[in-house]
Design a protein with these regions (language model features):
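Bacterial N-terminal signal peptides that target proteins for export
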Residues: 1-12
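N-terminal signal peptide c-region/cleavage motif recognized by signal peptidases
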Residues: 20-22
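N-terminal small/polar-rich segments of proteins
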Residues: 24-97, 130-169
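Residues that form or immediately flank small-molecule/cofactor binding pockets and catalytic motifs
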Residues: 44, 103-105
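Predominantly extracellular/luminal cell-surface or secreted proteins
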Residues: 75-79, 99-103, 111-115
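Extended, solvent-exposed segments with strong compositional bias
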Residues: 107-135
Length: 169
């Protein structure tokens, strides 16, 4: 066999082997929406609460038992105050303390898992049972519970903060 023929033969074998490899799309998870949480007018005599939800999905997840299992987790940033204890909304130079929690009891601060904060798993519910699946978040804990504590002196104005929602999978 000539050296040229050996090279062509080796290239054909490699091409044939590559064609035989199965192709698979990578799993991808996204957050579809986070509704804005509106506290309304602050009442300095009692806790003010608000709720909002996170919706999302993962695509190209393998059927159970056929590939790696994914465990999406949602974390929240501390916001503009750069602290979870407490978070602060601002209106100009004025500040209003508040926080975001993992449950309606409002006892565990939703954060990034550092200090006394917790992240929340985004359990998945299958939309399809064969082939690669599209899965939606199906977890009652994907509600964010907010609270502004009472007895704060706050100047009149519109208060806001920006929270980054991170999905890790």
């Amino acid at each position: 066999m000539s050296p040229l023929w050996r090279l062509v033969h080796a290239a054909l074998l490699l091409a044939t082997a590559l064609l035989a490899l199965p192709a698979a799309a990578a799993t991808d998870c996204v957050i579809d929406a986070v509704a804005a949480a509106g506290f309304g007018a602050y009442d300095g005599m009692q806790n003010d609460g608000a709720m909002t939800t996170i919706t999302g999905r993962c695509t190209n997840t393998p059927p159970p038992g056929t590939g790696p299992t994914i465990f999406p987790v949602i974390s929240l940033s501390p916001g503009l105050a750069a602290s979870y204890a407490p978070r602060q909304m601002t209106s100009g130079a004025s500040r209003l303390n508040y926080n975001l929690f993992t449950t309606a009891a409002r006892t565990v601060v939703w954060g990034n898992g550092s200090g006394s904060t917790a992240t929340v798993p985004a359990y998945l519910a299958a939309f399809a049972l064969s082939g690669n699946q599209t899965l939606a978040f199906n977890n009652p804990n994907l509600t964010i519970y907010g609270r502004i504590p009472p007895n704060q002196t706050a100047a009149t104005g519109l208060y806001a903060d920006t929270i980054t929602v991170t999905l890790t999978f």
